[in-house]
């Protein structure tokens, strides 16, 4: 492991973010899928359209139980001779069990990858990637492994231990730091993730998957589709994921409860998905909340008042 090479980067709220960082993503992992039936098998399991996914594209998706509750949220892309599903490590053993449940009937091999995952962030990261790849696509194969675009300021590199020495020798321009900076970019882009504390609790729309092209409403049947479709066409979904800011004494964790104001009282309002705490206590968090709250609703976490921050996208699914 390369963890000692990636120290903590201490940032305050008003600090400018580094324009090029590289981090080892120890809290993330890949499920890989190979075999003759991989496409048809995965198509019948997940919310996104696997069949139409081009070789050089990446998409968000979710894997649900029969009632439409999410086991995982992932980003899917082609890798080596199959597919890779990039997702949170804490929930990956549960997800592996669930995604393999019907695999015995198909020619497909599903496993957790032991590849090294590196996160490239910042405006200059793409410049470096452009210099070391022969493509301008969102998924690129290079001598170091597979690069996949996670957001406008985040790229994932799936690599192997034998490549790290040469790779590190070429990263003198980058700030090497721990993966908290990756989390900060992820939160600023309001990208959902699913840790084990949130497994099997929410439907995809509660984490905004429809807003980031993570649900296909035109594909054929998949597990949980009936609930997901009802949420769209009958309006049964009552939750969404929002971006909040406030002051915290300690880093909030996935699954933490956040309160909301009801008149002069407080009651449980929602659940933290992810959070980043700056050194000065200012904190950004993604939280699942009711989607019909009044504009003047206040929020409370760790005895501090929090407020909504505008999302970088709309919650429509068109």
Curated annotation (Swiss-Prot):
One of its GO terms (cellular component) is cytoplasm. It is found in: Cytoplasm. Folate binds at residues 28, 182. It comes from the Bacteria. SUPFAM superfamilies: Aminomethyltransferase beta-barrel domain, Folate-binding domain. GO terms for biological process: iron-sulfur cluster assembly; RNA modification; tRNA processing. Keywords: Cytoplasm, Folate-binding, tRNA processing. One of its GO terms (molecular function) is folic acid binding. Belongs to the tRNA-modifying YgfZ family. Folate-binding protein involved in regulating the level of ATP-DnaA and in the modification of some tRNAs. It is probably a key factor in regulatory networks that act via tRNA modification, such as initiation of chromosomal replication. This is tRNA-modifying protein YgfZ. It comes from Aliivibrio fischeri (strain MJ11) (Vibrio fischeri).
């Amino acid at each position: 492991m390369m963890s000692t090479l990636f120290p903590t980067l201490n940032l305050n709220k008003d600090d400018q973010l580094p324009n090029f960082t590289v981090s080892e993503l120890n809290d993330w992992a890949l499920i890989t899928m190979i075999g003759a039936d991989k496409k048809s098998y995965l198509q019948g399991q997940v919310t996104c359209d696997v069949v139409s996914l081009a070789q050089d594209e990446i998409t968000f998706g979710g894997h649900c139980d029969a009632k439409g509750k999410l086991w995982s949220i992932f980003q899917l892309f082609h890798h080596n001779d199959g597919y890779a599903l990039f997702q949170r490590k804490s929930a990956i053993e549960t997800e592996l069990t669930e995604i393999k449940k019907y695999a015995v009937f198909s020619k497909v091999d599903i496993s957790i990858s032991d590849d090294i995952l590196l996160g490239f962030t910042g405006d200059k990261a793409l410049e470096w990637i452009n210099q070391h790849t022969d493509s301008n696509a969102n998924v690129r194969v290079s001598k170091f492994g597979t690069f996949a675009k996670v957001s406008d300021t985040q790229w994932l590199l799936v690599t192997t231990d034998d490549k790290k020495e040469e790779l590190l020798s070429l990263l003198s321009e980058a700030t090497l730091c721990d993966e908290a900076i990756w989390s900060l970019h992820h939160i600023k882009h309001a990208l959902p993730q699913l840790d084990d504390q949130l497994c099997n609790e929410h439907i995809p729309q509660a984490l905004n998957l429809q807003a980031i092209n993570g649900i296909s409403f035109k594909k054929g049947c998949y597990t949980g589709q009936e609930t997901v479709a009802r949420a769209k066409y009958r309006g049964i979904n009552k939750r969404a994921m929002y971006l909040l800011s406030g002051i915290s004494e300690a880093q909030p964790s996935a699954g933490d409860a956040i309160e909301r104001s009801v008149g002069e009282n407080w009651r449980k309002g929602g659940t933290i998905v992810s959070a980043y705490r700056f050194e000065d206590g200012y904190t950004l968090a993604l939280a699942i909340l009711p989607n019909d709250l009044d504009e003047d609703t206040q929020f409370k976490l760790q005895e501090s008042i929090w407020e909504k921050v505008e999302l970088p996208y709309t919650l429509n699914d068109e």
